[in-house]
Amino acid sequence: MRNIKSFLKPVITGLLVVVLLMLTFTDTTFAQTVAEKAEESWNLRQTEIEQLYQEGNLNGALDSAQQAVSLAETAFGSGSLKAISSLMLLAQIHTELDQLEEANQIYQLTLETSVASFGEAATETLLVLDNYGEFLNSIDAEMAEPVLQEALRLSLEDDPQRAFRMKSVAVNLQELGRIAEAEDMLSQALKAFKSVFGEKDSDTLEAMAKLAQLYYSQGKLKEAQVLFETALPLMQEVLEEGNFIILESKENLAEIYRHQGKYTQSETLFIQSLQGAVAAYGEEDPLVMQIKSHLAQLYEDTGKLKKALLFHQQVYEIDLVLLGEEHPNTASDLNNLASVHRRLGDYQKAEKLFRKSLNIMIKALGEESPQSVSVMNNLALLLENQGLYDEAEPLFKKAFAISGKIQGERHPTTLALLNNLAFLYESQGDFERSELNYKNVIQLNTEIFGETHINTLSNQNNLAYLFLRDNRFEEARPIFTKVHRLWSDQLGVDHQNTLKALNNLGRVQKSLGNLVEAEKNISAALTGRTRVFGKRHADTLRSMNDIGELYVVQ
């Protein structure tokens, strides 16, 4: 452990300290003068540290911080508040320099010192626990948990900082994958923020945004939507126009609208947040890049593939300049570009980009990484689209095995790959193996997320489509009916998935001879698809073909 007292002190400060230690201070005026000078020296050192830090001179700031610790310990006592705050600042600078072991040791010393000087439940000690917990959470969530939980446990019910500690614990639980506990804790934190600071306080609004994001990450789109729609007007009332939380919340709500099929509202919010983020932070800011990427996905969803390609290309070109060709973000951009080329039917271009993306991902992150698994999956889908089943199947199986190993057999990505394997078997005409896999993934998603979760419903829809292809119409009908009803409620009647389920329900009814119901549903799907996607979209053309076939039968 580093010996703070070994650092060289400025000569004047050293002389002052010697006088402080040796004199009995019979001259009160002189004693006050010496103490005032020590205080002035310490304050000047803090100003110097801040200036060096702002200039980006972290090594200079570190030297000054070490001197500030030495001065504070000698002049005011090793257990003084000034010494403790100097130690915490020193730890923070070590953290900025990525000297994590040194930072950890200093935080531990600071905590021990504060407990000895003020007690474990003192405000000063809780502040050290807060900072130490945040430091640990940035490097290891498991190590951080007991520290953050202890700070919360020791907090009094009427302590204004208790709400912040609840939020920190919630973030930590989310990092640990304990989502239900995180949601409960963040809900409590939000109530505490509202009670202590009011609904329009910036910290309250930030907690609302975090809870909404947590809902969204679980697929709870309605809960997330309501919270964002409640928070945004309040944010716009009390925060500055270009505030990051406002722009990020607009982007998040736009993404929710996209998933719900509210494409016009989604595009409007995406463009608003994009314009605001560019004005506030510039074209190369991470938030700007994220908005462009999601806006491109919106254009993919609505069949505006050239617009999608344009935005994905913009993101790729900026990442290429800022991060270089071998960076994972650049590889992700190539993956996105390849996905659009696949949709455009340019399979040769798409395959080239997917393989380049995969090579970069493996080189940068290793084969056993979630990012590499994602690109493997997309490449396998492309091979399947081309009927290259012998190449697609081993790649799907490899991605599935890796995902199960690194993320767990019940992780959403692993389950999505199992679903894709089922679809591959369906494409090959192996309906028996396909059905087995679909039912397996439905069971797992039901256990993990519930029967009405969007992932579970998507798998059920796929099983119903398999039954449709296998002429098992009586088995397909109740599933399509259920999925359409729940998707209408969850995603809205104009969502792509909802319209797909409605159209397929019409096809089943046609095959069962229920021609009136079939016409009603296929016509409704055609009207919705034309309104949302236009006349030339593949989904619209599918409905046109289905209604034409129905009229021939009639």
What residue ranges belong to the model's regions?
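Conserved alpha-helical positions within TPR/SEL1-like repeat arrays
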Residues: 43-54, 81-96, 123-137, 160-175, ...
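Amphipathic alpha-helical segments of tetratricopeptide repeats
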Residues: 69-73, 111-116, 152-153, 190-195, ...
